[in-house]
Amino acid sequence: MSAEVTHTGQHPETGALTRRIMGVETEYGITCMDGEVRRLRPDEIAKYLFRPVVDKYSSSNIFIPNASRLYLDVGSHPEYATAECDSLTQLINAEKAGDVIVNRMAVEAEAALAREGIGGQVYLFKNNVDSIGNSYGCHENYLVRREVSLKALGRRLMPFLITRQLISGAGMIQHPNPMSKGEGFPLGYCISQRADHVWEGVSSATTRSRPIINTRDEPHADSHRYRRLHVIVGDANMAEPTIALKVGSTLLVLEMIEADFGLPDMELSNDIESIREIARDQTGRIPLKLKDGTTRSALEIQQVVFDHARRWLDHRVESRGTSNEEMARVLDLWGRMLSAIETQDFSQVDQEIDWVIKKKLLDRYQTRGNLGLDDPRLAQIDLTYHDIRPGRGLFSVLQNRGMITRWTTDEAINHAVDHAPETTRAHLRGRILKAADKLGAPVTVDWMRHKVNRPDPQLVELSDPFSPVDAEVDALIAYMEAHAETYRT
């Protein structure tokens, strides 16, 4: 292929976007414990968590200098939405930076509680289900072209997304919950935390029916050119390679659909029934009914998609987005994971895939203590795996001991804590926010609109999420600098 890709990463011959804007929204579970005693309600802890934010910005819904969004979501869940990223490793750094940022807030909240004579530690969990069965999300966002029908795209994507839990689930011990709307599944280990909490395939709702794909038309970009694919079904992941496989495989599938690369129609007869069954089948072999009357297993569906993706890499034209080298790493892990499921020998991925890592940990404790799967000590291990506090959460302990494979580095993650991605619109937002923070200028910011409120309102709208340069932003920052004295009075 000789034609060059555009600045958006779209190849003129295949139509595939190999440079794609994407982001992840993570809701965190929250509690405060003093020993085994719960000290405060989640809404009370959340107030302490966000008090410094509200004191500084007069709001609990803000954009921060690394261009990400930080806010308090429904149900008192702290939520962190990464800035716009255009490559896989950049996104992993941005997502992991969110863990660092909210953990720092938790440490500060503990200090504030102690000053008021309230003991206890604040716990933030990067998981998807609390102890009484309430679910909170980890949502992925992918930019697609406006001419793409999200419903049609969703139908093509659905078999992959429903079976993707096999390769990227977070894993959990599933306890029967009489309070849930579930189907009465028995005690067992599930490979996905989110599978039981979606109720539709494609829908414009997010909380009422929790679809696998949300179709609300909110592109946060030029609405004449782009749509935003909002994937709700994914688990929140701790291991960097699991995040890479979850997002990287999805990028490859989107590219193949856009390029019409010959993925066969494997539309499932019942999406919701299938996703529940797969979550409880670590072999991936339960036959699933397809709409064409045939059956395939989840493992077979993933293998078909993987085989096409491996061939696609030979045709994929590199852009400034995710490199072919990164995608080769994704395919290597994807292939090894499918082989592990096929052979039921998970030793080749037991330092990379969350649900496998956690199950190995639980199995070891269960065997050592001769424990039943419903033993509270195993439930504690299950939960503590997701505690984001370094040195306290089990995941971080394993990673510090070299028992978890890294995809990126602490240095890159810490850089992303304070710096916006440099290759997208996020860079411009970060520049504006840092200048405003330094000068004390009052600004109002969202994904597209950036406004300096005084002395005279100045508004810049950035509709191209791919562009990290803009003369109007330069002028806006110059305006703030010219009125620095105004902001000091």
From Swiss-Prot:
Keywords: ATP-binding, Ligase, Magnesium, Metal-binding, Nucleotide-binding, Ubl conjugation pathway. Pathway: Protein degradation; proteasomal Pup-dependent pathway; Protein modification; protein pupylation. ATP binds at residues 69, 82, 447. Its EC number is 6.3.1.19. GO terms for biological process: modification-dependent protein catabolic process; proteasomal protein catabolic process; protein pupylation. It catalyses: ATP + [prokaryotic ubiquitin-like protein]-L-glutamate + [protein]-L-lysine = ADP + phosphate + N(6)-([prokaryotic ubiquitin-like protein]-gamma-L-glutamyl)-[protein]-L-lysine. The active site is at residue 73. InterPro entries: Pup_ligase, Pup_ligase/deamidase. One of its GO terms (molecular function) is magnesium ion binding. Mg(2+) binds at residues 25, 71, 79. Pfam families: Pup_ligase (PF03136). Catalyzes the covalent attachment of the prokaryotic ubiquitin-like protein modifier Pup to the proteasomal substrate proteins, thereby targeting them for proteasomal degradation. This tagging system is termed pupylation. The ligation reaction involves the side-chain carboxylate of the C-terminal glutamate of Pup and the side-chain amino group of a substrate lysine. The reaction mechanism probably proceeds via the activation of Pup by phosphorylation of its C-terminal glutamate, which is then subject to nucleophilic attack by the substrate lysine, resulting in an isopeptide bond and the release of phosphate as a good leaving group. PANTHER family: PUP DEAMIDASE/DEPUPYLASE, PUP--PROTEIN LIGASE. Belongs to the Pup ligase/Pup deamidase family. Pup-conjugating enzyme subfamily. This is Pup--protein ligase. It comes from Corynebacterium efficiens (strain DSM 44549 / YS-314 / AJ 12310 / JCM 11189 / NBRC 100395).
